[in-house]
């Protein structure tokens, strides 16, 4: 009788420990998934900030460099394309193809802005325009924020992806419908060093 009680207590203790451990693993995965979503919202927030700055920047530059219409068209098209994918639902984090489309549109917009800013160097009157200088500083700060938020997103996505691939997280991830989150990568042109001429 005493042995049966000890064995029953032992199994009950093991079942309780397994239950507590399962709850802990489940809660950890939920928390990491929420952190990824929250960090993704910060990335979107900074892209939206850049998106909102562009019309003011373009209109300021247009005043001084009105004949650069092709460049303005490129910036407007890149902005429209980026705006079309900026508010994709959270499922973008589950679909690597949509994520790549989002990143490509944002990289294209960033490239168009860089071309716009490099063209402005040909117009000395812009260098004295306080509104332009303030917008340029704000855009530069926004680009830095985007870079920071992308890195933070990649960090938390890496932590999440590691947890759902390791045991015992892998057992829960499938049942919870959790998939690996995609990472931001460098733009294709970033792997080629720019040519510097003196």
Q: In which residue ranges do the predicted regions lie?
A:
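A helix-centric hydrophobic-segment signal that preferentially recognizes long
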Residues: 2-198
């Amino acid at each position: 009788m005493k042995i049966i009680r000890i064995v029953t207590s032992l199994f009950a203790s093991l079942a309780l420990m397994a239950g507590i451990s399962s709850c802990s693993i489940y809660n950890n995965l939920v928390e990491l998934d929420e952190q990824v979503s929250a960090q993704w919202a910060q990335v979107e927030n900074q892209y939206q900030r850049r998106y909102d700055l562009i019309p003011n920047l373009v209109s300021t530059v247009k005043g001084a460099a009105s004949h650069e219409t092709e460049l303005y068209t490129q910036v407007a098209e890149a902005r429209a394309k980026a705006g079309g994918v900026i508010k994709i639902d959270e499922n973008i984090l589950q679909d690597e193809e949509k994520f790549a489309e989002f990143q490509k549109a944002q990289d294209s917009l960033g490239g168009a802005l860089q071309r716009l800013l490099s063209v402005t160097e040909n117009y000395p009157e812009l260098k004295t325009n306080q509104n332009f200088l303030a917008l340029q500083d704000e855009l530069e700060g926004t680009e830095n924020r985007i870079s920071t938020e992308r890195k933070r997103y990649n960090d938390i996505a890496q932590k999440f992806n590691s947890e759902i691939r390791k045991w015992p997280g892998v057992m829960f991830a499938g049942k919870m419908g959790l998939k690996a989150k995609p990472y931001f990568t460098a733009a294709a042109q970033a792997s080629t060093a720019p040519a510097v001429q003196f």
